[in-house]
Amino acid sequence: MPEVDNVIKEKLKLLVEMDPKKMIIYPLIVFGIAIIIIIANYVMTGSFVKEGIELRGGSVITLQGVNVSPDEIAKSIKEKTGIDVTVEKFSGVGGSGVRVYVSAGDDVNLVREALKEMFPDVEPQTVVIGPTFGEIVREQGIKAIVYAFIGMAIVVFLFFRVPVPSMTVVFSAFSDMIIAIALMNIFGIELSQATIAALLMLIGYSVDSNILLTTRLLRRKEFTVEEAYYSSLKTGFTMSTTTLGALASLWIFSTAQVIDDIASVLIFGLLADFMNTWILNAGVLRLYIAKREGKE
């Protein structure tokens, strides 16, 4: 639709005309708010982000062939036992049913008895995840994120060989992750092996878009800074919207909680990445290029 295209182009041109200093300030304010949210969550709960059963330990009760709303099951268990549980549906080649997650410290036997009352024809299957295993998973996840950042930073510095643009790319990726974690706290999404993987995916996507922008601006020839920025912005906007569309479809049509969580975290991160790449990084690069060319 030509009208929609024109509106989008006009909105993108507003970014091109924005003061570079303001482009830096606004994303930093959002980053600061995200840090405050994470710290507040730590003060209230003792954890920067709520951890799933895989990390904190607990029990997983599986009921094959059950086709009841997870919310109804969780509500009924709460009424019968006073225990808060997480319930999700699953389906696959091996069959379908529900999984009930019980935190370590809660009486799993009470939950099992409540489930037997609700579904007398189904035998609950229980798997216990010990705190030691959860600690190992947590440590491995943290190491994976740290190593990914170190590897990404090395590659970026080797590619550009210029401190300011390289550090901005690294900071943008870090900010994407921090904002995604803050939104996980707001929407109650737990940190698990799946969401750790989603956070790692964000690093790769962030680097792609930032390298596109930085390369276009630093290595432009016949274009002005504004023209190069607008050209890369249109490309980046197309990349982001198509990816967000795919993730939104995944979130809407998925029936598995783990898929919903992955899609949600990626959506949070991609929205943050659009801001950090095309506003924050662009503002830093425009100031850097203006200063560098002013000295030449």
Curated annotation (Swiss-Prot):
Superkingdom assignment: Archaea
Subcellular location, record wording: Cell membrane
Matches recorded under SUPFAM superfamilies: Multidrug efflux transporter AcrB transmembrane domain
UniProt KW keywords: Cell membrane, Membrane, Protein transport, Translocation, Transmembrane, Transmembrane helix, Transport
Membrane topology qualifier: Multi-pass membrane protein
Cross-referenced InterPro entries: SecD/SecF_arch_bac, SecD_SecF_C, SecF_arc
Membrane-spanning parts: 23-43, 144-164, 169-189, 194-214, 236-256, 265-285
Any single Pfam family the record assigns to this protein: SecD_SecF_C
Gene Ontology biological process terms from the UniProt entry: intracellular protein transmembrane transport; protein targeting
GO terms for cellular component: plasma membrane
Family note: Belongs to the SecD/SecF family. SecF subfamily.
Subunit structure as annotated in this protein's UniProt entry: Part of the protein translocation apparatus. Forms a complex with SecD.
Role of this protein: Involved in protein export.
The protein, known as: Protein-export membrane protein SecF
The organism's taxonomic lineage, starting at the top: Archaea, Methanobacteriati, Methanobacteriota, Thermococci, Thermococcales
